[in-house]
Amino acid sequence: VTAEPLFIEYTPKSFSAEREAIIEQVNEILEQYAEAGYDLTLRQVYYQFVARGLIPNQAAEYKRLGAIINDARLAGRVPWNRIVDRTRNLQGVYHVADAQQAITEAARDFHTDLWATQKKRVEVWVEKDALIGVVGQACQPWDVNYFSCRGYCSQSELWAAAMRLLKYVGARQEVIILHLGDHDPSGIDMTRDISDRLSLFASEHLKPLTKLMGFHQTHRLITVKRIALNADQIERYDPPPNPTKLTDSRAKGYISEYGRESWELDALEPTVLNDLIQTHIKRELDGHAFAEAYRAMEKERKRLTETAEHWHETASGGA
């Protein structure tokens, strides 16, 4: 999150007293989360309004709030750098100015695999692109890879994931996938789908590895754990409900077990998601081995930094 909010007026506009109050509330929410290190998507801002009882949880209200925020940003009343779209990103070739910059950035970004000495290997998978920033902020301090499924994972992506995870199993690590999704008919089923298809793609390769590692059942080597959104979390945090989509082919089974309401993962506070993810990561982690690996990495980083600081001497052949 950028340190200072960036207000830029492109289209002057005046607002009614009611909309002024909404804009003030938007800025208060954005500043609160910026201070904690988070930027928000439009949907996360909307759920903050719903959770605070400011608007009802209705599609029309989401559309209305989005229109007000859009006008307010153009009028220079809501900062441009506090609301993000995590689903659209520019891709291209990375550039540096010269070798000095390259070696300096290499030293800064140097990172070894801190899980290489662990008995387990953890990844965090989330249903929605919009939450990848929150998930990343929780995972990065622990050197945990994370992944946005974008709904049901494609066949290609899940097969590639299975092949990647098998490399960890081959290194004698048990793989744990921590999965987060909506509490609705499809969101609940996605956890099962990931587990089933990973098992399908990995099963033939896992048979010899299972024997080698002394396990009797292959599923113990790659495990998918759903950590959110679950019924106990709905009861504890009371996120705003949505009507279950009756057009979903899984709706009948879902309604028989959970009723006619469903809940979006986005409705949980980013801080709640952060704490939840980090708690589950730490449960699978050997803290002593992690600390040792981190110290070794920092020692190597220091050597690289010293090389970067004296790069011109090295490049010119100086002692």
Regions found by a protein language model. Give the residues of each.
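Catalytic metal-binding/acid-base residues of hydrolase active sites
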Residues: 184
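Nucleic-acid enzyme cleavage-core boundary/entry regions
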Residues: 1-175, 188-319
